[in-house]
Amino acid sequence: PMGRTNHGELIDPPRPVESLRLQTAAGDWFDWQSVQDMWSMTLVSEGGCDAACIEILILVRQLRRATAANRQRIARLLILMPDANGRLELPNLGGLEGTQLLIADSSQRGGVESLFPLQLSEQAIPIFLIDPRGDLMMKHDTTKNSSKEILQDLEKLLKASENWAQGGRYGHQ
């Protein structure tokens, strides 16, 4: 086996996300099939998306742009869940068009917390990667990983996956 060269933390085993029932800002149920065959750079936030969260969303947008021709293979997701008091403030994503805002209601909070390794009390807002199969597979700590390191991981994953079958589950059921 080749030596590990990734900068992010691998989530092993990968965790399927399709069981999460999330709503779009318009109130429709989010269809995970809409991001099938794409890498999803995902943020999870509680209560809303403050200035630090918006900064990371801007970083995600810049990282996606930096992948040039591959940018069409990357989705940007922001999963919001209510805070401990049940409050949820929808952020203004002006300038961040293309970021899909997904809302986990209080009944889905446990599902989000069990899937995504979160330390909500910490200042760091991690960037999670969901692979084209719909499995959560990597986490980047934005206080430890530089944007260059995150981009290197992203480019490696895009290159490694460019020949994956489109529309299939790659031999997995």
Task: List each language-model region with its residue ranges.
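Sec/Tat-exported extracytoplasmic proteins
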Residues: L43, R64-R71, L154, L158-S161
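Short active-site neighborhood of thiol/selenol oxidoreductases, capturing the structured segment around
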Residues: Q33-V60
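Structural microenvironment flanking redox-active thiols in thiol-disulfide oxidoreductases
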Residues: A51, E55-L96
